[in-house]
């Protein structure tokens, strides 16, 4: 929460006074790809930090019907889609979920970010081995 009792990080569907500015790419509707270049789902919404005035998460609608959050720092966006190098498309199904679809707790943020961070080191067997 921040001053006034409002939630700090919310989806754009709640923070209707925020939007993606031109000429930046609005990723809503674009496919989301894992490191294996397979499609995991598509971008449903963006979550904005209203205090910092920046996007924190991408809400991904998976092909299974579930919805997960993807930290912006683990994504690369271009006109063809959102690319994630830390996990495979199949591993999106195991991303920790939020209890609410309109807000995120600090603990949930930690778990979600840790999942993608751990994927950077452990998503593939070859990532777990020494380099030399």
Model-derived features: where do they sit?
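Peripheral interaction segments used for macromolecular assembly
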Residues: 1-132
């Amino acid at each position: 929460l921040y001053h006034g009792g409002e939630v700090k990080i919310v989806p754009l569907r709640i923070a209707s006074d925020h939007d993606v500015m031109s000429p930046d790419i609005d990723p809503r509707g674009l496919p989301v790809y894992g490191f294996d270049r397979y499609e995991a789902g598509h971008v449903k919404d963006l979550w904005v930090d209203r205090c910092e005035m920046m996007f924190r998460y991408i809400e991904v609608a998976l092909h299974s019907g579930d919805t997960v959050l993807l930290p912006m720092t683990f994504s690369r966006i271009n006109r063809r889609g959102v690319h994630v190098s830390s996990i495979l498309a199949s591993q999106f199904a195991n991303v920790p979920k939020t209890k609410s679809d309109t807000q995120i707790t600090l603990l949930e943020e930690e778990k979600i970010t840790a999942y993608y961070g751990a994927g950077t080191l452990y998503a593939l067997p070859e990532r777990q081995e020494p380099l030399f």
